[in-house]
Amino acid sequence: KNLFYILMPVLLFLLTNWMIWSQREPVKGEVIYHVCQRSFFDSNGDLNGDLNGLREKLPYLQELGVTSILLFPLYESDCYHNYFANDFEQIDSEFGTMQDYIDLVNEVHRRGMKIYLDMETQYVTSQHVWWKDAVGNLESKYSDFILFEDESHQTPATMVFDLRLLNGFDGKVIYATTVNLKSKNVLDYNIALFSYFMDPNKDGKFNDGVDGFRLDHAMDHLDGKPTLTNLFAEFWKPLITSLRQLNPAVKIVAEQANWSDYGFEYFEKADIDRMFGFGLQQAILSFNKTEIIRNAEVILGQTPAGKEQIVFIENHDMDRFASVEKDLQRQKLAASLLFYMGGVPSIYYGQEIGMKGKVYSFGNTDGNDIGRREAFDWYTSGEGKGMSHWYKDSGAWWTNANQKANDGISLEEQENDPNSLFQFYKQTIHMRAQHHALSSGNYLNVENSNDHVLSF
């Protein structure tokens, strides 16, 4: 099968060309590993991936070349993905304890790595104290913490996508609502919450705290709610400013709710550090030279000084790249673009071994996304110590699972195969780390007349 492209990166190492490279100094060679900890490695045999399991596998991530880890939300939730909180202040017991979290963070830092935490504090479930205490109680100290549709506070507002409830894969019905981000009390609470995860023991040192946060579904005007406008200036920027006062080195990454948005307004109005290069992701998957260049010149070329774009191929809300593009050589080609074009590359766990998965259509349930979030495949057989089959025997997403024995898509099958996708990822990441031009340079297109050659 002919490749649509031959990748031809032009590596400019001569001293006379250093002027084109960025004067900014991000973490040299930073490579983020975006991991659903529930699906990664189970340390205690309950089929749930957990914090101790992730800590056990840090040597694997370092061997791959990963320098930073981005976790899914940690807090207590009825949702398997933990995006809608029952309690922001409690870690999901299936992940472990607060001490397990601190042990993980300390070990990450001991190894010279960084750790980021996904935070979605814009919604809460009916199990949250704000809901429980405020609904029907105008005297509640939480009366302005969530939005209501009526003056008597009997009906909480809808949440994202104008939903009132979610049907869990395990049969749970989960009610949720939107947090009132215009409340000064809510802003103060968020400052305290984020600050706690940055410095749990409040000693002014950050070895036991996260290095930054991912802000899920961030918007200036949240979900079209009439009262939740101008949030960049009134909520996000004050929050971020307060966090930087605590630790100037903290990194704030925002996921733009509109994936066609380049994110420049987030940089300007909310002072976000990093955005996701969705446009470049779509262009890479298209293997369309014109689209790749157009998006790279905007996303990588026009991002303001001091700000960065995260470059990626897949994430937890998308079909796995290996299910979209089944050709191994094209998978490797996309990886080359991911690591060599610029920005901060991010790998979604299992991407490095070509894990497959698409969204299901099994009715109104959050189980439809499980195909995109299956257990990391450590073994040829698909079974063994640490396999995180938390969705086992729970429904059609188990009987239709992508994971198969002896399919070539496991670490065990690929780690000693010099031609495997895993080995290509490993070699490409280490190549990037060895050259400042690749790890810290700015993207610059080098024009050529061949429609099948991309040079930069």
Where are each of the predicted segments found?
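Bacterial Sec-dependent signal peptides at the C-terminal "C-region" and cleavage site
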Residues: 14-26
